[in-house]
A protein has these predicted regions:
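Terminal helices and disordered tails flanking the catalytic cores of nucleotide-processing hydrolases
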Residues: 1-109, 114-115, 277-361
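Alpha-helical scaffolding flanking metal-ion-dependent phosphate/phosphodiester catalytic sites
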Residues: 154, 177, 181-188, 205-301, ...
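Short clusters of hydrophobic/aromatic residues that line enzyme substrate/ligand-binding pockets
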Residues: 24, 193-194, 200, 238-243, ...
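Acidic/His-rich, divalent-metal-binding segments that scaffold phosphate/diphosphate chemistry
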Residues: 68-206, 220-221
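Short alpha-helical linear motifs
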Residues: 142, 195-204, 231-232, 255, ...
Length: 361
């Protein structure tokens, strides 16, 4: 018989009128505070808040945690912060930021010195369900939160793709490393261009397009060629229409092809000053419809197959403000999934659509 897992929950996310589907325990999990079936009242909340002084947490079972944290009483940014702390995403982001802010590349930019960080990132792929990790990646956030966050996201997405392709552990680590360092050359570009709060001018875009070459220069002689060339070639296209070298077909390595998909996906689900963040479902449709030409179709289809499977059965907020559940995501029409809402099952359209995908892991 499996042991049910307890999770820490801040008392402030309980609310007056909540009917408990399971027991609530104290912050150590040893003392039953509120039994299953009991209704939370304002008086009980006040007692819980004062029960253990500065410790304002209780312990609940995993199922109760998810139910509470996906409720509309809990603001999305709160759910996000708790999820990122639980996964260790916030810790990874901080560590990567500390490295990227240093310009003494010789002191840290090597496979040996980055190995512990890469193992930690790769370990998240084993320890957490992809949907939990994707909830960290997909949460709408401004691009000026940093190159570091984008690099972490691409590393995680690369690792997921490697796992879904059943690649051996060494290749998973190589792809995670390639994702982490794919844009390292942007540290050589003026910050006012990298973090410009608008679309770049033609002149600025020309400068920005040098970043793959700068990445190559920084990584040359320090890393496996697969890592270096993924950084140089992740903006190349199979049809020869990419940059900086205009290579095509078999000249484009597998590591670069996979990194290109991860890079595009993360860019599209992130907000910029001149565009909003796209829902994952929208990006799935764009990838299937080949709006990003020159990608490896085999890898794109594998990415979509696995992403669609992970988002099926997830909770969503619909345009009418009510909750629903994704029952099916059509491959050729991913931005119009089949939704169940209050017993009604139908496909979304232009007037009834998904506004938010909910996760609380």
């Amino acid at each position: 018989m499996s042991v049910r897992k307890l999770r820490t929950l801040p008392v402030e996310y309980l609310w007056d009128g909540l009917v408990l589907n399971d027991d609530i325990f104290n912050h150590t999990g040893a003392v039953l505070l509120l039994p299953k079936g009991e209704t939370v009242t304002r008086n009980k909340l006040d007692k819980l808040m004062g029960f253990y002084g500065d410790n304002k947490n209780v312990m609940v079972y995993e199922e109760t945690y998810v139910e509470i944290m996906t409720n509309e009483h809990v603001p999305p940014e709160v759910r996000q912060k708790l999820t990122e702390n639980h996964v260790g995403y916030a810790h990874l982001h901080q560590n990567i930021g500390n490295l990227f802010e240093r310009r003494d590349y010789d002191s840290w930019l090597s496979g040996e010195k980055l190995a512990p960080l890469i193992r930690e990132v790769a370990g998240k792929l084993k320890d957490f369900d992809p949907v939990t990790i994707l909830s960290c990646i997909n949460f709408p956030r401004p691009m000026d939160e940093g190159l570091q966050r984008h690099s972490l996201n691409v590393a995680l997405l690369n690792g997921m793709q490697a796992e879904w392709l059943d690649l051996p552990p060494d290749d998973v680590h190589t792809l995670v490393l390639a994702g982490l360092l794919h844009d390292i050359g942007k540290t050589m570009i003026p910050e006012e261009i990298v973090n410009a709060p608008r679309r770049l001018t033609d002149e600025e875009l020309s400068v920005m397009r040098n970043h793959p070459v700068y990445s190559d220069d920084l990584l040359k002689g320090k890393f496996d060629d697969n890592v270096r060339l993924a950084a140089r070639h992740h903006h190349e296209k199979l049809n020869g229409g990419g940059y900086p070298d205009g290579i095509a077909g078999e000249q484009l390595g597998i590591c670069a092809r996979i990194t290109a998909i991860s890079d595009i996906y993360d860019a599209m689900v992130s907000a910029r000053s001149y565009k909003g963040a796209r829902l994952p479902l929208d990006v799935f449709d764009m990838l299937y419809q080949e709006e990003f030409d020159g990608l490896d179709r085999q890898f794109v289809m594998n990415f979509l197959k696995n992403m669609r499977a992970r988002y099926t059965n997830q909770q969503v907020v619909m345009s009418n403000g009510r909750r629903g559940e994704i029952l099916y995501i059509p491959l050729n029409d991913a931005d119009h999934p089949i939704i169940r809402q209050d017993g009604d099952i139908r496909q979304t359209d232009e007037e009834w659509y998904c506004k938010e995908i909910l996760t609380a892991n």
